[in-house]
A protein has these predicted regions:
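Non-heme Fe(II) oxygenase metal-center motifs and adjacent flexible, charged/small-residue loops
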Residues: 1-207
């Protein structure tokens, strides 16, 4: 099990919501934020909205073990090889969450206009009850969760520099989450969501 002493920040109880937060988990967050901003080969993907291609409102990069392709929003991401920095952060988050990770989606929110809409990390390659470890670096942003059937009030968390949030169990099946836009002047935020790809394609493979 995860180290309960790490996850001391209470999350409002809600049905089938298995979320825990470790405030200030990453003591050397400043160093890693600065490094990721300059080392990461950021790209801005596109999605189709009402038949039109539009850029997503954030920058991103996908890293992972060989064969860990990831499909979301109609896009297929091929993994970049682990860097020394990301492998270290992966191992630290895996130890805290007491689970293994083989991939990470790195998102860069440049201003308060960058965001991600309501969604669940429920793609088939993540399995039925995925564990997602979300590491926040940089500006504090508001993270919201809501039940898909709207049977419970939304849960709102302000995620700060160095915080680690872990979602597990039925959370992805029954809840959605988002990072909303804000009109407040905020600095840059980098978020790393570590996950495990079930049955990744072998090296050089695809489908």
């Amino acid at each position: 099990m995860a180290d309960r002493a790490l996850f001391h920040s209470p999350v409002p109880p809600a049905p089938d919501l298995e979320v825990e937060v470790s405030r200030g988990f990453l003591a050397d967050a400043d160093e890693h934020l600065a490094g990721l901003l300059v080392e990461t080969p950021w790209t801005q993907g596109e999605i189709t909205v009402f038949g039109q291609r539009r850029p997503i409102p954030r920058l991103e990069a996908w890293y992972g073990d060989p064969g860990c392709t990831y499909t979301y929003s109609g896009r297929l991401l091929e993994p970049l090889p682990w860097t020394e920095r990301l492998a270290d952060l992966r191992d630290r988050c895996a130890d805290a969450a007491d689970t293994a990770f083989d991939s990470v989606l790195v998102n860069r929110y440049r201003t308060g206009d960058d965001a991600v809409g309501w969604h669940s990390d429920d793609e088939p390659e993540l399995g039925q009850r995925p564990v997602i470890a979300s590491l926040s670096l940089g500006a504090t942003r508001r993270f919201r969760l809501r039940r898909r059937d709207r049977s419970h009030d939304p849960v709102v968390l302000d995620l700060e520099h160095g915080d680690l949030l872990v979602m597990r169990g039925p959370t992805q099946a029954l809840w959605e989450h988002c990072l909303t836009r804000t009109a407040r002047p905020v600095g840059e935020r980098v978020n790393l969501t570590f996950r495990w790809i079930v049955n990744p394609f072998p090296t050089g493979g695809g489908g």
